[in-house]
């Protein structure tokens, strides 16, 4: 608000729905799909045709590893994607920015961070992958950059 930027908080019943439908375990994937749907619906109500997500470089790499480890596929989200069914384009303008740089900027500007309301925050597969990368980085300080570049090149040689 102090920057003069209009924003909206979209209230949903996603947590209640997930608690009622899923008894045990993680429901991150379903929750993400439901949040995406809620944002898309709200964007359409506002007459928007683009949604900007704050996914950063670390999210990009972590998503690829999650897909590889838990789904058996080599996938991560693209920087931009058009969804024909909703006529919405998703953009990710921070995809080349490491999380640490965003946190540094946030601290420098004294921006308040919105706390993740997820009851599983800090105890998810994504958090496991984040910690794994942190450990791997101790032996290979450039591992995230190498993984990022490998994803961008998108080739498996001699396959």
For each predicted feature, which ranges?
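Catalytic subdomain that performs nucleotidyl-dependent activation
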Residues: 50, 58-138
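A short, charged, Gly/Pro-tolerant segment at domain boundaries
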Residues: 124, 138, 142-159
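ATP-dependent adenylation/nucleotidyltransferase module used to activate substrates
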Residues: 1-64, 70-73, 100-108
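Short, solvent-exposed coil/turn elements at secondary-structure transition points
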Residues: 13-15, 96, 119, 153
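AMP-forming adenylation/ATP pyrophosphatase catalytic core
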Residues: 34-35, 81-86, 156-159
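Alpha-helical elements of Rossmann-like donor-binding domains used by nucleotide-donor carbohydrate transfer enzymes
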Residues: 38, 131-132, 146
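A short, structure-level motif marking secondary-structure boundaries and short turns
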Residues: 23-25, 86-89, 144
């Amino acid at each position: 608000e102090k920057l003069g930027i209009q924003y909206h908080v979209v209230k949903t019943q996603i947590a209640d729905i997930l608690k009622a439908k899923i008894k045990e375990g993680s429901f991150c994937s379903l929750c993400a799909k439901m949040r995406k749907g809620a944002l898309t619906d709200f964007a359409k109500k506002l007459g928007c045709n683009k949604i900007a997500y704050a996914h950063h470089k670390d999210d990009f790499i972590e998503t690829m590893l999650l897909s590889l480890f838990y789904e058996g596929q080599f996938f991560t989200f693209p920087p931009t994607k058009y969804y024909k069914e909703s006529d919405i384009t998703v953009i990710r303008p921070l995809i080349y920015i490491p999380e640490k740089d965003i946190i540094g900027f946030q601290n420098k500007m004294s921006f308040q961070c919105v706390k993740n309301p997820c009851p599983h925050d800090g105890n998810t597969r994504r958090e496991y992958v984040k910690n794994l990368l942190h450990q791997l980085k101790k032996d290979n300080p450039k591992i995230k950059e190498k993984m990022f570049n490998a994803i961008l090149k998108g080739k498996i040689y001699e396959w």
